[in-house]
């Protein structure tokens, strides 16, 4: 849905022009995968600071396809959300305009394009976790490789292939084990993981409820959801600090090439990735900043951090479409799918 944020017109745009900076357009259009609540918070703060009115359209999994389909006649200025692999792909297709935010040099190389075509905004670790009322720390898996052991048959549940984090997780595991043991071994791993999985859920809340009710002991999910269910919903969950690391998805942002409001787009990227912009989202929505400087005022759990799994996202970007098709078509057992009522 198209949502407008803010209608505050003030004189700040004129001030920036007088100060020798580029004058901003009056409005901005954003395509995003983020929640409406989060987008509203960010856009209101941006409007407050710049006077630029923002409209956002929440597109979830269709984001990349929409940007791609409008390449000859862009309707939006900003693509906000989605993983590194997706941004690498669209950059190659010529969908983005490079920008140079003031914080770019502070951002680690893993979280940005070398030529400024896209930037990482939030780190989203995917972790394994278990119900500690059903399993002791000794019995629980220690690493991703343990999930395929015979002892865990029927004790694992996860999201289905509609979940973007699950898709990134499967692609990451195929890439990681291909690099480590060869591609045949990687597919053997994913096949055994499917065999050990009791159910796939099309809803995150249903999956967590199933773990809470003891239908299975082990699952995997983005870290902030696990923490939310542990702390706010009082579920008996224990997070596993995997030996190989957490599959860390980087949520990105980019300015769309030939967009109607390029100056406002560059200013929005400047705002979102800044220390203040990152802290706002960290404290309001538990999203871990990609910019290290923002961590000092972020929630405490973000500062301990989880070691990221060593992954080459350019390899994942090149192969993700084929890998996920193979997983969905040849491996995923559709009879294990559970849909929300």
Question: For each of these PLM feature ranges, what is it?
Answer:
Residues 312-341:
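Conserved C-terminal helix/tail region of periplasmic/extracytoplasmic solute-binding proteins
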Residues 85-89, 212, 217-236, 285:
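A ligand-binding cleft/hinge motif common to bilobed small-molecule-binding domains
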Residues 2-4:
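C-terminal motif of bacterial Sec signal peptides marking the signal peptidase cleavage site
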Residues 109, 124, 189-193, 200-201, ...:
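Periplasmic-binding protein-like
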Residues 246, 251, 256-311:
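Mature extracytoplasmic/periplasmic domains
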């Amino acid at each position: 849905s198209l949502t407008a944020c803010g209608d505050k017109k003030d004189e700040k745009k004129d001030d920036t022009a007088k100060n020798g900076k580029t004058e901003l357009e009056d409005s901005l259009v954003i395509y995003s995968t983020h929640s409406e609540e989060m987008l509203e918070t960010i856009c209101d703060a941006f409007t407050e600071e710049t006077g630029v009115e923002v409209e956002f359209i929440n597109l979830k999994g269709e984001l990349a396809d929409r940007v791609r389909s409008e390449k000859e006649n862009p309707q939006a200025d900003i693509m906000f959300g989605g993983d590194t692999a997706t941004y690498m792909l669209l950059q190659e297709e010529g969908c983005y305009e490079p920008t140079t935010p003031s914080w770019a040099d502070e951002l680690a190389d893993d979280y940005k394009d070398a030529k400024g075509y896209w930037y990482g905004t939030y780190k989203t670790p995917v972790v394994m976790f278990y119900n500690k009322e059903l399993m002791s720390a000794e019995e629980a898996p220690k690493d991703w490789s343990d999930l395929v052991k015979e002892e865990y048959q029927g004790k694992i549940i996860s999201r289905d292939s509609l979940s973007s984090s699950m898709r990134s997780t499967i692609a990451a595991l195929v890439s990681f084990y291909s690099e480590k043991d060869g591609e045949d071994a990687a597919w053997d791993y994913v096949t055994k993981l499917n065999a050990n999985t009791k159910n796939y859920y099309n809803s995150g809340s249903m999956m967590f409820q199933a773990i809470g009710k003891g239908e299975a002991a082990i699952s995997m999910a983005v870290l902030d959801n696990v923490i939310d269910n542990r702390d706010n919903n009082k579920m008996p969950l224990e997070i596993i600090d995997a030996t190989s690391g957490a599959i860390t998805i980087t949520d990105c942002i980019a300015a769309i090439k030939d967009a109607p409001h390029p100056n406002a787009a560059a200013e929005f990227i400047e705002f979102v990735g800044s220390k203040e912009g990152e802290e706002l989202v960290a404290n309001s929505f538990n999203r871990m900043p990609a910019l290290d400087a923002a961590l000092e005022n972020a929630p405490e759990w973000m500062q301990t951090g989880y070691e990221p799994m060593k992954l080459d996202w350019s390899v994942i970007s090149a192969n993700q479409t084929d890998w996920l098709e193979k997983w969905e078509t040849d491996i995923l057992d559709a009879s294990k799918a559970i849909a929300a009522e």
